[in-house]
Amino acid sequence: MGRKKIQITRIMDERNRQVTFTKRKFGLMKKAYELSVLCDCEIALIIFNSTNKLFQYASTDMDKVLLKYTEYNEPHESRTNSDIVETLRKKGLNGCDSPDPDADDSVGHSPESEDKYRKINEDIDLMISRQRLCAVPPPNFEMPVSIPVSSHNSLVYSNPVSSLGNPNLLPLAHPSLQRNSMSPGVTHRPPSAGNTGGLMGGDLTSGAGTSAGNGYGNPRNSPGLLVSPGNLNKNMQAKSPPPMNLGMNNRKPDLRVLIPPGSKNTMPSVSEDVDLLLNQRINNSQSAQSLATPVVSVATPTLPGQGMGGYPSAISTTYGTEYSLSSADLSSLSGFNTASALHLGSVTGWQQQHLHNMPPSALSQLGACTSTHLSQSSNLSLPSTQSLNIKSEPVSPPRDRTTTPSRYPQHTRHEAGRSPVDSLSSCSSSYDGSDREDHRNEFHSPIGLTRPSPDERESPSVKRMRLSEGWAT
């Protein structure tokens, strides 16, 4: 490896100049020592630095060498800097350039210096190796975490495949989840009034853990449901149409539900053969699976201007086994083509008023749809006590059948109020009159959550009733 060349000029940096002077002074004395030993001569060095500080070196005694110098009168060799530069030029070397002084100094070649440099080199190599290790990109420690949406012991209303395995668990539904259950994610708008064809739903599934079309779990796997009081009002205030029960659970997978489109003046009629076929299949499915009538307790009411307006703000539904309906009772309930299954518990005076205003074909189809839904889901509402009553005896026929389709008038009233299927679609907004009938009649839902008109909302006849022992008779 070649030596680094430096330019022989005055060093401008004071510190660098001082370091270079100390190093080269020691190198010069080392060379004088080697020369005196190797060649058996006497050498004396006298050095003054830039601050006129004296540094001297003598191979023997300085005074003795200086005495010889003063007494010597014969011709002798005397050189200056210019002579050295000229001699270097003749040898082919540039006088302004010189090898690295570190290579000539004794400091760089002493055993102590070599050990120190060796240690420094080892430290540098170790540091470089550490830097290479640190330069390697760190491994990815991210671990995928899967969060289960539904568990075996939890009920999520927004999950369409959630299951309930623990019959003793009564979960509280989150407001956002309750709002999701009423969202139009599972809804299908029926065709407009101009269309004469009905809305055909998909095949009804019989899965044990699937949910109904309204987002609630299958009652076969959910013996107890508890809805928090503040969430029902949020559902009624949601700006979305109510969901249609197109995915109702049933044991007949080939059964299709025909839901007529909503209109004011034209309601498509269905033949009696289709009605009898639907009722026969519904009765067969209900006889194969008995319906446990729920014991409904009415919770804290809300203000008249909020939520359902005078109706209970939450319904705590528990499934009792002491009251059950047989297939004979359920078949007798279809007196007007199972239209009484719209409200299995009781029908208020306001509800009867609007049920009288509906044509029998619409009532027959609503009964055929809602009875299938009520056979699988027990989300019932019992807001007051009126005519339709069910006794607890399994074989006795029901009493007070006053809501048959033969007693309904064939004309339709639109200015008096809304029908239950129309009032549910307008439950998310303010009940401001009959000017919204043109927009509300196209939504239909068999859910029994209704809302009174403004004139009947303040009526003292509409009262709440707590049912603790059984059904009202």
UniProtKB/Swiss-Prot annotation:
- Map out region (Disordered) in residue numbers: 91-116, 180-224, 375-473
SUPFAM superfamilies referenced in this protein's UniProt entry, alphabetically: SRF-like (SSF55455)
Glycyl lysine isopeptide (Lys-Gly) (interchain with G-Cter in SUMO) cross-link, renumbered residues? 391
Its protein name is Myocyte-specific enhancer factor 2C
Any idea which residues bear Phosphothreonine here?
293, 300
Similarity section: Belongs to the MEF2 family.
Q: What is its main location?
A: nucleus
Entry keyword annotation includes Nucleotide-binding: no
A Pfam family: HJURP_C
Residue ranges of DNA binding:
58-86
The ranges of region (Beta domain) come to 271-278
Positions with biased composition (Polar residues): 375-390
Q: What is the effect of changing residue 239 to R?
A: Reduced acetylation. Complete loss of acetylation, 15% less transactivation activity and slightly reduced DNA binding
What keywords tag this UniProt record?
Acetylation, Activator, Apoptosis, Cytoplasm, Developmental protein, Differentiation, Disease variant, DNA-binding, Epilepsy, Intellectual disability, Isopeptide bond, Neurogenesis, Nucleus, Phosphoprotein, Transcription, Transcription regulation, Ubl conjugation
The observed outcome of changing residue 271 to A is: No effect on transcriptional activation
InterPro entries according to UniProt: HJURP_C, MEF2-like_N, TF_MADSbox, TF_MADSbox_sf
The superkingdom listed in its UniProt entry is Eukaryota
